[in-house]
Design a protein with these regions (language model features):
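The beta1-alpha1 cofactor-binding region of Rossmann-like NAD(H)/NADP(H)-dependent oxidoreductases
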Residues: 39-40, 57-69, 104
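Canonical Rossmann dinucleotide-binding motif of NAD(H)/NADP(H)-dependent dehydrogenases/reductases
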Residues: 3-32
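Catalytic Tyr-X3-Lys loop
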Residues: 89, 100-120, 144
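Residue(s) in the substrate-gating loop at a strand-loop-helix junction
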Residues: 148
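Conserved NAD(P)H cofactor-binding loop of Rossmann-fold oxidoreductase domains
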Residues: 86-94
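Amphipathic alpha-helical dimer-interface segment in Rossmann-like NAD(P)H-dependent oxidoreductases
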Residues: 113-137
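Hydrophobic positions on the long internal alpha-helix
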Residues: 69, 84, 121-125
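Conserved glycine-rich Rossmann-like NAD(P)H-binding loop of the short-chain dehydrogenase/reductase
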Residues: 28-44
């Protein structure tokens, strides 16, 4: 895929792997929508990116929040060509600690962001990507999912 003038939606794009990816993609000529939960960090990331970038505040685990971010991307850039899922959280708790078992609610939050959130973004973005005119290799876009222990 030729990156020049492509639109990339990057979850967790205000820091870490997401921000580093945004820097590489924008250097290759892409337009970037930073999707992040933290508005201050997202603003700062966009100001540091040397190119066409904007941000959308969203919780990847919430359908309406993600749809709003996708709508903002479509309004701003008219398309989505690349989705890069980098949003993720971790829990710094032992499975069994001094106070007993790791709270299950903490683990459910991690799953909501890291698993449900990733699927939520890709399924909603894929709807818009499917509307793209296929390129010479019949490609309408690419979705990249990452995983880590945050």
């Amino acid at each position: 895929m030729d990156i020049k003038n492509k639109v990339a939606l990057i979850t967790g794009g205000a820091s870490g792997l997401g921000f580093a990816s945004a820097q590489k993609l924008i250097a290759a000529g892409a337009k970037i929508m930073v999707m992040d939960l933290n508005e201050d960090n997202a603003k700062k990331a966009c100001s540091e990116l040397n190119g066409e970038a904007d941000y959308a505040i969203a919780n990847v685990a919430e359908e309406a929040s993600v749809q709003d971010a996708i709508n903002k991307t479509m309004d701003k850039f008219g398309r989505i060509d690349i989705v890069l899922n980098c949003a993720g959280i971790g829990s710094a708790s032992k499975t069994v600690g001094k106070d007993g078992a790791h709270p299950l609610d903490y683990f459910k939050i991690v799953l909501d962001v890291n698993l449900v959130g990733t699927f939520n973004v890709l399924r909603l973005a894929a709807v818009e990507m499917g509307k793209n005119e296929p390129e010479k290799d019949n490609e309408c876009g690419v979705i990249i999912n990452t995983a880590s222990v945050a």
